[in-house]
Amino acid sequence: MTSEVLQGSGLSSSAFEVMIGAVLSGLYNDMTVSPVLIAQIGQYTENIYFGKPCGLMDQCASSVGALIHIDFKDNDHPVVEKVDVDFSSFHHSLCIVDVHASHADLTDDYAAIPTEMKEVAHFFGKEFLREVSEEEFKAHIPELREKMSDRCVIRALHFFKEDARVEKAVSALKNNDFDTFKSVIKSSGDSSYKYLQNIYSNHDETNQAVSIALGLSEDILGDKGVCRVHGGGFAGTIQAFVEDDYVETYKTEIEKYFGKGSCHILKVRKYGGKKVEL
């Protein structure tokens, strides 16, 4: 097996897991195992055998392919919708920048996010925050702050706003409104930095490669694009949506800081794992 997925980027393990699932489905099941089930098997493997408390989003992205919109209300049967979009039709490209800081030792930081959000949900007698209304949450913030850390509260605030942003972003793409989509990406990234706080580890605040990449990217891009942290955060990569006529400039400038080959200009593949008959 060969791979061009960046090691420690936050997607490498998911890509590996679903590739193995696709291979086994092809060898023994005539490719009949659904992409979502392969993603769920990959998540189980990562949770149980590798001790990484990941969700299902990365595995679904790798297994289903295309840009996808996922509703996790029923964890056993998530609703996955492909969003048909070609960034080139909007004269933009997706750039992924490797900041050369690995996710490998950040399991505790990543795990704290769902743990703290669930702590807020448990205050209301629920398992997940989606079962709590934003209005009810805001009405009890003083009591929440007495019972738990402020970070739990601020991360919960991000959750409610982020869910709304997802719907707005999907709607914008379906309506060919790329300016609104970029605006949502920008506000989502800002919220990740300020409220979700997944840009650098509180256990190692002297190393802030993602922060540097975002700051430099905003300076380089100006009004030519938007950027945000990519994946689970804390390290790994950032993403930037850049106007096509400015992509090479952005790539040249950002690679001055992170090295030649650190900026990858990508296209979103429309398919997940496939068997190719030779």
Tell what function each PLM region has.
Residues 69-228, 240-278:
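C-terminal nucleotide
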Residues 22, 236-237:
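Catalytic DNA-binding helix-loop module of base-excision-repair DNA glycosylases/AP lyases
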Residues 1-89, 221, 247-251, 270:
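Gly/Ser-rich oxyanion-binding loop with an adjacent helix/lid
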Residues 2-5, 100-101, 233:
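Short, histidine-centered active-site or binding-site loop motifs used for metal coordination
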Residues 15, 237-241:
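FabD-like malonyl-/acyl-CoA
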Residues 13-14, 42, 58, 97, ...:
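Buried hydrophobic positions in well-ordered alpha/beta secondary-structure cores of metabolic enzymes
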Residues 230-236:
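Short Gly/Ser/Thr- and Asp/Glu-enriched loop/turn motifs at secondary-structure junctions
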